[in-house]
Regions:
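Short HxH-centered metal-ligating active-site micro-motif
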Residues: 44-81
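Non-catalytic interface/targeting segments
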Residues: 1-47, 59-60, 80-81, 88-119
Length: 119
């Protein structure tokens, strides 16, 4: 299973979770099946590039997103693609994955999506 966490840099499991999904500098992908960690730059239009951040995630075959927060458009895009999203992550990638495993994070929906960019 591949899990993705929006992150502040390239520190792998010890990197800080970025609280703004679309503007995360990087995405850290953890493949739980084979123990591989991959860090991808966010090259979406949000960061001066092209495309949407969700497209980067879809291309990697991610099944679970663990985020601090994200907007309703991203929630809908992930839902339509079959990617399950959990909100409320904080700390490091390692902390976020541990919290997800412990069922401490809420599944994302339109009610708990961010309504503005003040997070």
């Amino acid at each position: 299973m591949k899990i993705c966490v929006p992150t502040m840099g390239e520190g792998g499991m010890q990197e800080a979770v970025c609280q703004h999904f679309g503007r995360a500098p990087t995405f850290t992908i953890v493949d739980l099946d084979i123990g591989v960690i991959k860090v991808l730059p966010n090259v979406s239009e949000h960061m001066g590039g092209t495309g949407l951040p969700t497209e980067t995630i879809f291309a990697e075959g991610v099944q679970v997103m663990i985020v601090g927060g994200l907007g309703p458009k991203a929630v809908l895009a992930f839902n339509q693609a079959g990617v399950v999203v959990f909100v409320g992550a904080a700390g490091t990638v390692n902390d976020a994955v541990d919290d997800w495993r412990a069922k401490m994070l809420a599944q994302a929906d339109l009610d708990n999506a961010c309504k503005d960019h003040k997070h």
